Amino acid sequence: MPDGSEAAVIKVLGSIDEVDADQWDACAGTNDPFICHAFLKSLEDSGSVAPDTGWTPRHLILEDETGNLAACAPVYQKSHSYGEYVFDWAWADAYARAGGRYYPKLLCAVPFTPVGGKRLLIRPDLPEGSQRELKSTLVSGMVALAERSGFSSLHINFTNVDDGKICGG
């Protein structure tokens, strides 16, 4: 995968505990405490992020051919819009009036934290071209998960400009 020739293995995790903390943090970097493994783990361990609170972890990871983490993203299945700091209640209402079901939806974000930053986390030692390709693969994986699971939509909240461009924004 570092040269772009190997296939990435995408996995969906039900808990941040399913990924090695050091490997996650290697992708997350050290500049943003809200995307580090320990912070996301504390949200799960405290019960703040759990299915019964409307935040079901669905983290995406991409492993290289040796099983090492190359990319990851904090992703959640949401049954409401609380804790997102994006006020889409009117969207949900309009969706329902049109006969649709807005929830569950898929959200790539940091729970309860309206702080901008990267959401598509890539190992920094990979070449720039591979990093962009992996970010696109993460987004494609989220879209596929949303479609396969019957989610109404995919949201990526408070991302940085570079990640926004990958998403088409």
Language-model segments: residues:
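N-acyltransferase acceptor-side catalytic subdomain
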Residues: 1-169
